[in-house]
C-alpha cells in the first residue's frame, strides 16, 4: 500500500523516524496535492527544515494529473505528455522515474528539429533477484549509465489541442538518472500522433502541407485558405483584443473559420471574440501556419530531418513534437510516488480535508480550518501557506477584510469543467491502412454535429493502461459548465449519449462497446473571460499577504502545464531558502515574452 494511502485510512500525522522533527519546527500548510502542491512538499523536505502538511480535498493524489483506475484499466485525464524546456524540471522527473530501456517504445533515437539534450539512461542488464519478502515483481535493475537523446519539452495539452512553450535556460544538459531501476517506476518513450477529425476525415495536427490535406479540403477551400493567409500577413489586426484576432493573425480568416472557431467555442462555450488574446499567448504561442509548413519542409527535404537521432526540443513548438516521455502507468504514478516520498521523509498528507476558512492576522496567514468527509473540523497552524485552490474559493475562505472590487473580480472568474467517458471496445471501426489500431494518442473531433471534443486512445499512451491488450480503451472528452444538462446527466444516460455520438461519426460500432466509465472533473480549465480582464486587482490583493503563496493552475488562475505549475512551487521554495520570495517572478512563469513569440 502506498504510504500516503495510510492517511486516507485515518492516520492523522506521519513523522518519519530519525527526521528530528520538533514542536519548534516551522510548518508549511499546502492546500492541494496536485503537481504544484506535491512539488512544494518534496522540495521543502529536500532543501529546508520546514515540514510540509498537505491538505487534499479529494480522495485522489495528483490533481488533474492523477490516473483513474477502473477494473484494471487506467485513464489519463486530458492527456499529459512529459516534456520540459526546464532543465530543472527534467532532472526532477528523471530522478523519480528514469527512462525504461526495456519498455515498449523505449527507442533511444528520438528525432525533432532544433537543439538536442542528452539524457543518461541505465544500460540494459539482467535483473537482480527479487529482494526477500517483496514478491516476484520486486526485482531491481542495476546498471551503469548509458547516453541516449530524448526530447525534453513539456506538454500538458489543453482541450484546445494547443500547448505551451516554456524556456527556462538554453544550455545543453546531461540529465543523470539513478543506477537502480524498479521495473515499474520508469518512463516509457512513446510516439506521438495527433490528428483532427473533420468532415468525417482525418487531417494532420497541426495542419501540414500534404497531399492528404489538399485532397480532404478540396481545391476551392485550399485556394481560399492560401489567399486568406496572405491577406492576414499583409494586414495584421492590431491591437489583438481577442482570441479571434490572435488566430486570424496567425492562420488567416479562412483557416480560422474552418479549423478553429467552432471547435474552440465548443470547448469554451464562449465566442472567440469574447475570449482574451492572452489565452492564445498561453496555449499557442510559437505555432502558426508558417511554422507548421517550415516543419513539414524540414522533415521532408532536409537530410536527417526525420528519423535522425537528434532531438527537437528548444527550437520546436511542442505542438510539433513527435515523441514524448510517459510514466508506465500514467501520470498519477509519478505523483503517487512523490506522495510516498513526502510521507516517508516526515511530511503529512491529509486526504479528503477541504479548506473552508483561512485565518489571518493583518496581512499574515496563521492557520486554516478544514473539514473532512464526515464533517469533522480541524485547524492547521503554520508559518507558510501554499494555495492551489481556485482563487474564487480562496477569497471566499479568507477571514480578512476583502475590498468590494476584489470580491467582485474573484466571484466573476470562470472555469470550464470536464467530463471523460472511458469506453472499452473490441475494436474501432476506423483503422490504419494495414488494419491495425489507429496510432493516434488523441484525436480532435471538430465535427459540429456532436458535442464530443476530443478522443484519447489510451493503448497508445502506454500499453500498461489497458488490462487486456486485445481490447481498445478510449476516452471521450467533453467540455461544459457544471450548470449544463450534460454535467447533470446520470452516468448511465451519459454513457449511452457518448456511445451514440462516437458511433454517429463513424469511429466505433455501438455494439463493440464492452464497458464504460464516467469521470467528472470540476474547474479543470481556468477561463480567460468573465472578470479576467481585471485580474490584476485580485492578484495585487492576494500578493499583499506576506506568507501566502499562490501556485499551480487554479491557484494562480493560469492555464499552466504541469511543469509550469511545478516551477511556481520550486520558485517559492527558492525564495524561502534565500530569505525572500519574489512574487512577481511567480506570475512571470509561462508569461514571459519569449513564451509568447516565435524565436526569430
Describe these PLM feature segments.
Residues 47, 327-328, 351-506, 534-535, ...:
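Mid-domain catalytic core of redox enzymes
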Residues 45-70:
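Glycine-rich FAD pyrophosphate-binding loop
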Residues 28, 51-52, 385, 513-516:
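Hydrophobic anchor at the start of a short beta-strand
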Residues 71-233, 285, 289:
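Dinucleotide-binding Rossmann-like beta1-alpha1 core, especially the glycine-rich loop
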Residues 36, 60, 392:
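Conserved Rossmann-like nucleotide-cofactor binding loop
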Residues 26-54:
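N-terminal Rossmann-like FAD-binding beta1-loop-alpha1 element of flavoenzymes
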Residues 190, 201-206, 210-361, 366, ...:
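Active-site/ligand-binding neighborhood in enzyme catalytic cores
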Residues 4, 8-14, 67, 137, ...:
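Conserved flavin/dinucleotide-binding core of flavoenzymes
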Amino acid at each position: 500500500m502506498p504510504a500516503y494511502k495510510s492517511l486516507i485510512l485515518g492516520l492523522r500525522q506521519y513523522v518519519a523516524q530519525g527526521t528530528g522533527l520538533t514542536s519548534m519546527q516551522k510548518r508549511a500548510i499546502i492546500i492541494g496535492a496536485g503537481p504544484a502542491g506535491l512539488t512544494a512538499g518534496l522540495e521543502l523536505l529536500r532543501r529546508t527544515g520546514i515540514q510540509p502538511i498537505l491538505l487534499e480535498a479529494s480522495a485522489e493524489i495528483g490533481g488533474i494529473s492523477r490516473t483513474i483506475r477502473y477494473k484494471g484499466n487506467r485513464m489519463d485525464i486530458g492527456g499529459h505528455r512529459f516534456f520540459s524546456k526546464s532543465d530543472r524540471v527534467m532532472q526532477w522527473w528523471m530522478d523519480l522515474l528514469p527512462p525504461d530501456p526495456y519498455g515498449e517504445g523505449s527507442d533511444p533515437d528520438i528525432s525533432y528539429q532544433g537543439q538536442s539534450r542528452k539524457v543518461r539512461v541505465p544500460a540494459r542488464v539482467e535483473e537482480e533477484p527479487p529482494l526477500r519478502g517483496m514478491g516476484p515483481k520486486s526485482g531491481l535493475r542495476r546498471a551503469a549509465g548509458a547516453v541516449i537523446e530524448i526530447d525534453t519539452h513539456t506538454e500538458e495539452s489543453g482541450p484546445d489541442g494547443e500547448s505551451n512553450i516554456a524556456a527556462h535556460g538554453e544550455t545543453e544538459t546531461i540529465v543523470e538518472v539513478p543506477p537502480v531501476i524498479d521495473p515499474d517506476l520508469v518512463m516509457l518513450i512513446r510516439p506521438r500522433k495527433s490528428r483532427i477529425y473533420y468532415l468525417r476525415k482525418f487531417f494532420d495536427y497541426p495542419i501540414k502541407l500534404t497531399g492528404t490535406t489538399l485532397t480532404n479540403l478540396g481545391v476551392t477551400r485550399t485556394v481560399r485558405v492560401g489567399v486568406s493567409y496572405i491577406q492576414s500577413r499583409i494586414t495584421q489586426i492590431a491591437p489583438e483584443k481577442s482570441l479571434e484576432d490572435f488566430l486570424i493573425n496567425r492562420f488567416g480568416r479562412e483557416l480560422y473559420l474552418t479549423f478553429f472557431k467552432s471547435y474552440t467555442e465548443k470547448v469554451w462555450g464562449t465566442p472567440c471574440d469574447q475570449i482574451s488574446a492572452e489565452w492564445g499567448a498561453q496555449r499557442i504561442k510559437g505555432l502558426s501556419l508558417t511554422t507548421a509548413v517550415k516543419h513539414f519542409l524540414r522533415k521532408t527535404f532536409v537530410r536527417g530531418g526525420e528519423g535522425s537521432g537528434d532531438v527537437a526540443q528548444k527550437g520546436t513548438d511542442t505542438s510539433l513534437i513527435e515523441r514524448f516521455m510517459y510514466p508506465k502507468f500514467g501520470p498519477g504514478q509519478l505523483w503517487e510516488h512523490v506522495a510516498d516520498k513526502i510521507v516517508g521523509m516526515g511530511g503529512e498528507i491529509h486526504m479528503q480535508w477541504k479548506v473552508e476558512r483561512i485565518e489571518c492576522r493583518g496581512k499574515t496567514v496563521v492557520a486554516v480550518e478544514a473539514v473532512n468527509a464526515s464533517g469533522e473540523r480541524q485547524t492547521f497552524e503554520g508559518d507558510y501557506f501554499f494555495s492551489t485552490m481556485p482563487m474564487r474559493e480562496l477569497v471566499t475562505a479568507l477571514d480578512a477584510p476583502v475590498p468590494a472590487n476584489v470580491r467582485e473580480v474573484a466571484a466573476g472568474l470562470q472555469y470550464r469543467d470536464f467530463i471523460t467517458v472511458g469506453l472499452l471496445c473490441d475494436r474501432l471501426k476506423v483503422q490504419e491502412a494495414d488494419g491495425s489500431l489507429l496510432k493516434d494518442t488523441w484525436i480532435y473531433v471538430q465535427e459540429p454535429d456532436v458535442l464530443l471534443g476530443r478522443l484519447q486512445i489510451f493503448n497508445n499512451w502506454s500499453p500498461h493502461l489497458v488490462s487486456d491488450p486485445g481490447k481498445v480503451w478510449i476516452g471521450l472528452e467533453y467540455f461544459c459548465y457544471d450548470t449544463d444538462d450534460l454535467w447533470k446527466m446520470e452516468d448511465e444516460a451519459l454513457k449511452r449519449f457518448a456511445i451514440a455520438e462516437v458511433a454517429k461519426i463513424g469511429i466505433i460500432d455501438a455494439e463493440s462497446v464492452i464497458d464504460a466509465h464516467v469521470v467528472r472533473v470540476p474547474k479543470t480549465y481556468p477561463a480567460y473571460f468573465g472578470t479576467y480582464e481585471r485580474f490584476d486587482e485580485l492578484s495585487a490583493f492576494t500578493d499583499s499577504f506576506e506568507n501566502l503563496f499562490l501556485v499551480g493552475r487554479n491557484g494562480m488562475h493560469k492555464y499552466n502545464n504541469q511543469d509550469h505549475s511545478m516551477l511556481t512551487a520550486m520558485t517559492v521554495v527558492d525564495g524561502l531558502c534565500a530569505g525572500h520570495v519574489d512574487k512577481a517572478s511567480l506570475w512571470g512563469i509561462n508569461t514571459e515574452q519569449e513564451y509568447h513569440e516565435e524565436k526569430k
